[in-house]
């Protein structure tokens, strides 16, 4: 997987519209981005949406507090958003669940009435309760199965988990992405962006050197490899280092770097869009 280190190209969004002289230099960078202010926001919290929480065994207003951090995927000419939503109760004043919305134009969305992935009385509860299920990122394999990485938060640590679905409505949880590494299971981990290729409007997970690759982390950015998109191994260089890149002093990303949507394998390398924070 050394090719990962050789191919990586980073999308650094310094502005929405690069100057003409910069356009050629950043031709790989998917720029410019333009906000559709006339329709924003495309989703809002809803105090009328209710859901029977299986852990609390009571009705909760599952998206009353906020809706944010979505992942987008196209299925049957329809744009689907998997989004994080929070109620406003409990010791954290909110448990996160993942909802589903859809649109035929990518701008105007309708919501499914209940969350599609949430804390339950299952094997993932130890990681998910009661902070919840957060920040989905989604790709598809060549057989039409969707793989969603998401963050589980138990109130102490965030952990990176994965689930699969054939229809985006019904999900099977597969637990921690690093479940075969006890040391990693007990560490803070989140934000898994699996490397994919865009084919016919779909984000299809792609192998590099015979294995799938995923960028993850929210202090520094790391990379992991997998044979099946479910069980992942953290990669290290020849010196045992795991960091691909980290914050840069005195820059816009001086305090935090975190993978955004799935990384894209292009003819110019791997394009990774990441979010950041400065201090």
Predicted regions and their residues:
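Extended ligand-binding clefts on enzyme/binding-domain cores
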Residues: 259
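Beta-rich carbohydrate-recognition and catalytic domains
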Residues: 16-131, 139-255, 264-279
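Hydrophobic h-region of N-terminal signal peptides that target proteins for export
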Residues: 9-17
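Sec-dependent signal peptide recognition
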Residues: 1-10
């Amino acid at each position: 997987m050394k090719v990962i280190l050789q191919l990586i190209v980073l999308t650094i969004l310094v502005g929405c519209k690069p100057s003409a002289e910069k356009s050629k230099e950043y031709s790989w960078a998917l720029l410019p981005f333009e906000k559709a202010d006339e329709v924003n926001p495309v989703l809002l919290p809803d105090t009328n949406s209710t859901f029977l929480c299986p852990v609390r065994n009571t009705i909760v207003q599952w998206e009353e507090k906020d809706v944010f951090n979505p992942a987008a995927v196209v299925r049957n000419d329809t744009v689907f958003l998997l989004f994080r939503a929070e109620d406003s109760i409990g010791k954290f004043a909110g448990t996160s669940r993942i909802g589903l919305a859809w649109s035929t134009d990518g701008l105007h969305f309708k919501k499914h009435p209940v969350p599609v992935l949430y804390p339950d009385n299952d094997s993932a509860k130890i990681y998910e309760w009661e902070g919840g299920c957060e920040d989905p990122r989604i790709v598809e394999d060549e057989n039409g199965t969707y793989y969603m990485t998401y963050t589980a938060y138990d109130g102490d640590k965030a952990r990176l988990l994965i689930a699969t679905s054939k229809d985006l409505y019904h999900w099977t949880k597969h637990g921690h992405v690093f479940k075969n590494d006890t040391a990693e299971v007990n560490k803070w981990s989140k934000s898994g962006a699996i490397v994919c290729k865009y084919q016919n409007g779909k984000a299809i997970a792609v192998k590099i050197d015979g294995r799938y690759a995923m960028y993850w982390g929210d202090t520094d950015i790391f990379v992991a490899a997998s044979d099946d998109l479910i069980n992942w191994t953290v990669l290290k260089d020849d010196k045992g280092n795991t960091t691909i890149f980290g914050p840069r002093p005195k820059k816009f990303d001086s305090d935090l770097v975190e993978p955004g949507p799935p990384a894209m394998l292009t003819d110019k390398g791997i394009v990774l869009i990441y979010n950041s924070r400065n201090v």
